[in-house]
Amino acid sequence: MCISISQVSRLRIHSFGSSCCERVHGWIKNSSSLKLLDVRASSVDGKARWIRRNVSTTTQGSRSNTKSSVLGGTVPVTRIIDEESRTKVQPFGNLQQRLAQDKDLSKLLTVIVSDLETTGLHRKNERIIEIAAQDIAGGGYSTFQTLVNPGVVPITNAHIHGIRNDMVCRPEVPRMEELIPIFLRYVESRQKPGGYVMLVAHNGKSFDFQFLINEFNRCSYEIPHNWLLLDSLPLARENMKSVEPTVKLSSSLEALADYYSLTREGDAHRALSDVLLLSKVFQKLTIDLKLSLSDLVLRCHTASDISAAMAKNKKA
């Protein structure tokens, strides 16, 4: 079941693992590119918090004229952004080790697989033009996908993903500063009470996470401190090396799909298609490598880790 946000003014996320029904609010009403997909399986919904730095920014156009649908009424996007909870989450000391030792880790951790498509490969100057994510626990509306309006930044790699300027440079396609609070709400709707999020991406440390961090910073947001970032590429390399120690096998998503005899849904190098495939591949990898949730947590990075590495590489 695919819900187009432009077709509905009210949404509820149904938890099939419990009797509760969490409200989803703040979706962009006129965005025909924004979709929630209904994958019927058990899930647990919860809450998270995020912060937006108090930095004055300006964007092209009038954001106050862009409306978002909220349960009970319609308010400007800027109001939703500015009036979200600003409760600061204090950084956790040695989060990965502390969390990995928690006996109730499965009750705290939500694993979300993600993928991005961009205008080009330069981490600083290019923009995200598509984002997709899926909670591997499944459940109602567990999958998120939208195009993103990059503004004046031209798309130079349309031959890779097939996304053209005329597809994203449209008023109904949300800009990143409008999309971030919506994406945060999606993650919040999947998060377990008082829990943490593990965001998984293939080649995430070198690509997806750097883009995401740069875009959050550009829009004066911070990646929530209770998000952990896991790159699945090292897992793939480790597994493929164990299969053929003397031969360097490809660890690309396509090669892994062939290795596991998995069928792709949709076009290659589109965010949603890659997410659906990576969700299957990731679970296969964790089984083959016999990795527990604790093992995965210890292999995660924080946004501050990746930001520090980016700053170090820039100086070098």
Curated annotation (Swiss-Prot):
GO molecular-function terms, A-Z: 3'-5' exonuclease activity; exonuclease activity; metal ion binding; nucleic acid binding
Sites where the protein binds Mg(2+) 1: 115, 117, 274
Cited PANTHER family: LD40940P (PTHR13058:SF19), THREE PRIME REPAIR EXONUCLEASE 1, 2 (PTHR13058)
Gene responsible for this protein: DPD1
Disulphide bond pairs: none
Observed phenotype of the null mutant: No visible phenotype.
Protein's UniProt keywords contain Transit peptide: yes
Protein name as annotated: Exonuclease DPD1, chloroplastic/mitochondrial
Residue ranges occupied by any Exonuclease domain in the UniProt entry: 112-282
GO cellular component: chloroplast; mitochondrion; plastid
Active site, renumbered: 269
Residues annotated to bind Mg(2+) 2: 115
The EC number(s) this enzyme carries: 3.1.11.-
Transit peptide feature, positions: 1-63
Tissue specificity remark: Highly expressed in mature pollen grains. Detected in flowers, senescing leaves and roots.
UniProt effect for mutating residue 204 to S: In dpd1-2; loss of activity
Compartments, as annotated in UniProt: Plastid, Chloroplast; Mitochondrion
Activity regulation comment: Inhibited by free nucleotide diphosphates (NDPs).
